[in-house]
Amino acid sequence: MATLVREADGTARPGERPSSGARVFIAMSGGVDSSVAAARLCDAGYEVVGVTLHLWDYPDDGSVKSRCCAPEDQHDARRVADHLGIPHYTFDRRALFREHVVDPFVEAYLAGETPSPCVACNRSVKLRELFPLAERLGVSWVATGHYARVVLEEGGARLYRGRDRHKDQSYFLHMLRSDELSRLLFPLGDSTKDEVRAEAIARGLPGAEKGESQELCFIPSGRYAPFVADRAADRLRPGPIVDRDGRVVGSHGGVHGFTVGQRKGIGVSLGRPAFVVGLDAASGAVHLGDEGDLYAAGAEIADAVWCDDAVFPLEAEVRVRARHEAAPGIIERRRDPATGAESFVARFASPVRSVSPGQMAVVYRGDRVLGGGRIKAALRSQAAS
């Protein structure tokens, strides 16, 4: 079995694991990853309890399949639990998911932002619920099928990237505190997706060859604009499309239909490549520019969470999107002299493309996650200096 908690070269002491026979909650979606994670926990001798959160409702016409919240996936989670001989429970958290994930998602798009709903779900729904549920049932440990690692160091439990850099999900878990990490197990952290898939097939797990969705679980079509429009039709604000010289070159039905960096589907033709470089929800304007206008020298970071040993200014690497290669930079802490409120600014060593408000800026040093927060604004050279 892969190591559940791994030593980090030079700084970490050997990872402590729950003793054999300890009770462990495993979040089960019915997918390959959580199924293999559950099987590995069973192999390690733990008393494993499967838990599925019912988060979203889908049409009953069979049009939605292989999503982490679809009815058949909940059924698959139970089938896997039966296959492994472990108890399985489903808890209804649809109202919580709507409040903390879906509604903020809609609000963010109306505000011209590109949100990170998977971060909100992990922070405010899944782990927020799993820890109390575990405590209520006398369970000390919680496990998930995320591709990430927890390392026990002198200062406490730390979050590290998963070994599979293509599947690494530490970006979506950056907000976890040390006391939470100390109770988390990531059985897949040292494995690649191909290894996990092969293991699921070899074990004969139900759903072992199930496909993997690249879309949000609550918008399986990937069509975000209609989803937002259906839920906020009376708040959509038409506005102008403006080129880099300030000329109005078209109109649109709402900023919710655009994201920074978008090139296709803008609705106008300028005779040259044009990209969405800014969204102004207050005026309703969509600003276009050349590809070079997409690059930012820095980012203002809000709602930040940092590890307790972070010292500023912090020299590290910053990921501004889940699939973005981390860019070197310096994170500075600023304090408002009037209110005392803290804010943070990331200054990149070289300009970074498509820094989108609403996405997360997650900070790394090597494989270790130091923290991060929501991108409030992309900063041009003069603003980041």
UniProtKB/Swiss-Prot annotation:
Catalytically driven reaction(s): S-sulfanyl-L-cysteinyl-[protein] + uridine(34) in tRNA + AH2 + ATP = 2-thiouridine(34) in tRNA + L-cysteinyl-[protein] + A + AMP + diphosphate + H(+)
- Keywords noted in UniProt: ATP-binding, Cytoplasm, Disulfide bond, Nucleotide-binding, RNA-binding, Transferase, tRNA processing, tRNA-binding
Active-site residue list? 121, 217
Ranges in a coiled coil: none
Q: What biological function has been recorded for the protein in this entry?
A: Catalyzes the 2-thiolation of uridine at the wobble position (U34) of tRNA, leading to the formation of s(2)U34.
Output this protein's name.
Answer: tRNA-specific 2-thiouridylase MnmA
What family does this belong to? Belongs to the MnmA/TRMU family.
GO biological process assignments: tRNA wobble position uridine thiolation
Predominant place of localization = cytoplasm
NCBIfam families under this entry? PRK00143.1 (NF001138), trmU (TIGR00420)
State the GO CC annotations. Answer: cytoplasm
Per the record's keyword annotation, is Disulfide bond included, yes or no? yes
Entry's PANTHER family? MITOCHONDRIAL TRNA-SPECIFIC 2-THIOURIDYLASE 1, TRNA 5-METHYLAMINOMETHYL-2-THIOURIDYLATE -METHYLTRANSFERASE
Q: Do the record's keywords include ATP-binding?
A: yes
Any Pfam family from its record, for instance, is: tRNA_Me_trans_C
Which residues does ATP bind? Answer: 27-34, 53, 145
Highest taxon, organism lineage = Bacteria
Organism equals Sorangium cellulosum (strain So ce56)
Cysteine pairs bridged by disulfides in the record: 121-217
State which Enzyme Commission number(s) the record gives. 2.8.1.13
Q: Where is this region: Interaction with tRNA?
A: 167-169
The upper taxonomy is:
Bacteria, Pseudomonadati, Myxococcota, Polyangia, Polyangiales
User: What molecular function does GO assign, one term?
Assistant: tRNA binding
Q: Where is this site: Interaction with tRNA?
A: 146, 359
